[in-house]
Amino acid sequence: MSNAVKRSTDPTVFSPPRQFSFLRHAAVLKRRGVSRSKHYADIQAGLYPKPVAIGPRAVAYPDYEVDLLNAAKIAGKSEDEIRALVAKLHAARGAALSS
């Protein structure tokens, strides 16, 4: 039997991977295919998670969050569903340290 974590095909079901990498801002914009202003507008509207501080003057995004949100868009999720997903992602960030 495999030790691999079984991933859901539903983009609203969150299961963080055991390994991930951080994507810097330019890489996120490229993966999303949006402008810088649209990206920040989505963050303000709750449609995209806030970046994670990785240094005193550097921020990035966990790659799995970017992929999960892209999958939600592809699946045709509504803005309300995406806001709920973003809220789950933010909550999971805090819960990761407490487990």
Indicate residue ranges for each PLM-predicted region.
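Glycine- and charge-rich intrinsically disordered segments
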Residues: M1-S8, L89-S99
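Polyanion-binding surface elements
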Residues: S2-A45, Y64-G76
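Residue-level detector of alpha-helical recognition elements and their boundaries
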Residues: I43, I54, V66, E81-I82
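Short Lys/Arg-enriched helix C-cap and helix-to-coil transition segments
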Residues: K50-V59
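A short, Lys/Arg-enriched interface patch at domain edges and termini
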Residues: D67-L97
